Amino acid sequence: MQDHHSTNESFDVIVIGGGHAGCEAAITTAKLGFSTALFTINLDRIAWQPCNPAVGGPAKSQLVHEVDALGGIIGKLADETAIQKRILNASRGPAVWALRAQTDKREYSKKMIEILQNTDNLSLKEAMITELDIAKTEEIGLNSKRTVKKRIKGVRTFFGSYYSARSVIITAGTFLEGRIWIGNKSMSAGRSGEQAAKGLTENLHEIGIKTERLKTGTPARVDKRSIIFDDLDIQPSTAADKYFSFDPDIKNNMPQVSCHITRTTTKTHQLIRDNLHLTPIYGGFIDSKGPRYCPSIEDKIVKFADKESHQIFLEPEGINTPEIYVQGFSTGLPENIQLELLRTLPGLNECKMLRPAYAVEYDYIPATQLQTSLETKEIEYLFSAGQINGTTGYEEAAAQGLVAGVNATRKLSKKDPIIFTRESSYIGTMINDLITKDLKEPYRVLTSRSEYRLTLRGDNADRRLTQLGYQIGLINEKRWSAYQEKMKLLEEEKFRLNKTRLKNTEEISKKIELETGSKIKGSITLKELLKRPDFHYSDLIKYNLTEKNLGSSIQEGVEIDIKYEGYLKRQKNNIEQINRQSCKSLPQEINYEKIETLSLEARENLNKIKPKNFGDASKIPGVSKADLTALLVWLKIREIKKEKANIFIEKKLSSKKHSV
């Protein structure tokens, strides 16, 4: 990069992109005392929700709880701007319970802008970054081997302004060379109504970072005044008292609204089949992979041809807008056919379309080029977070933004990065998946991706991560005190339930036996009572067997801990056993191609990813248990050879001293 202009300003950290990843990253670095600038193409669309105006859902809600437990923002804003909340999977076990909030998208963005503007050490800049400035230094290592180290120095905007930075975090979302498609028509855009980011992809290639192409999409928005709601099933808000945030000061003053449900019809399906050739994917205009778990309506009709109907949700985008988001109905069909399709749905026969659905393809950075800290392997102090890493969803983006922000500051402070493991969090599961697997489609977090989902619940995210958030410096003293008080009450209640015993001769015992149909033999502790499948903490309250008026989160935590005690102990033992084996480090200089006892696929994948330890190596596709055993043996032989060489050298040196 030629420096045609002098430095405008200098910052410790520059964040490129003002989406959910960028906001979390910028707030994190600024809160930790580092001068930060957040650059975005449009300051009026900060933390925008260009697709679904919702936060949470299966596994995603666990991510939001975790980000909040660490001191992040997304959970608080989702709580404060929620206009509907529901618990998903409530009839199943606690491992998969999920809070989902419909949010007011304009209110969400407005509140995020207010937070950014009032965060110390943080500057907001409207500009398009097109170049990264890299410094190169040559180092001489072992055996006089020369290596070139690259480090980020600063950034340049489209119009030539230069800003120096000690660290840079790229959170460009879908904007890198973004192109939106409606039918066979396309235009350059990061999302509808906003220009794409030009130039940065080419610059990334020049500095040694590869990019590939992905696709996503968003459905049409319709005018709620044109919908016949009497023809639809209603879906009311049923969990307004549930929160993503563990901060007791967070409140919601938004009015609660209902969503509605309609379904596709045979007419819908036939119209799609007749026009498949006009879509960007089936028409062959683009070949980028779309998200498996959020397919277009044409994908659903093709892949589930035997299904007669698909559920479609109508979700308000806010309190003061007539726009309704047609969830489950994203498409790349031409605009006129989209309206025809919408009018085949019950309740939408006379609807007015305010915004058409569109597909968007964009460049992303395959995350196998990143370290676990989200720093790029190629360039020091350059981090990448969010949808640019191949993920889909605000929640995944926010979590990565916080991790990148924390680790950028730790790198600048010469501290070791914070590494989130699969055993500790969904954040760790997601990052491990991203950096060890070649993505062929946008990645979304799922409960099925975690081997430890009973341990990694949403309700206990604070117990798992708040202490870490406090140690990092993102949890303030007030929040820390509230957390400690909660832990104290939770442990005291579990102790009380274990010690308090009911005799079967007591009147309350007879009442419980009569109403539950389960006998009490001799006597029983309240803990043993709570272990029964059909007995809940609410029953303890009902039978006046409580002492303190504990909050619902403590009641829930106590019940889960007791009911699932055996399972949780087994999972804890498994985690400890895995940790003992997986923490064994793997030297980064190993050339796996030369280890002939490894399978060819294992050699290729290990060399490409360069795992830091056996735990990471075990999660790489194509690396079998046999490969891990062979690698362990190879390392042991290597260590023995090194020890023998050291003994030989010591003897040589010793004999030389004696001869002198």
Curated annotation (Swiss-Prot):
Its main location: cytoplasm. NAD(+) binds at residues 290-304. PROSITE patterns: GIDA_1 (PS01280), GIDA_2 (PS01281). GO terms for molecular function: flavin adenine dinucleotide binding. Keywords: Cytoplasm, FAD, Flavoprotein, NAD, tRNA processing. It is found in: Cytoplasm. Its cofactor is FAD. GO terms for biological process: tRNA methylation; tRNA wobble uridine modification. FAD binds at G17, G18, G19, H20, A21, G22. GO terms for cellular component: cytoplasm. The keyword Cytoplasm applies. The keyword tRNA processing applies. NAD-binding protein involved in the addition of a carboxymethylaminomethyl (cmnm) group at the wobble position (U34) of certain tRNAs, forming tRNA-cmnm(5)s(2)U34. Homodimer. Heterotetramer of two MnmE and two MnmG subunits. Belongs to the MnmG family. HAMAP family: MnmG_GidA (MF_00129). This is tRNA uridine 5-carboxymethylaminomethyl modification enzyme MnmG. It comes from Prochlorococcus marinus (strain MIT 9301).
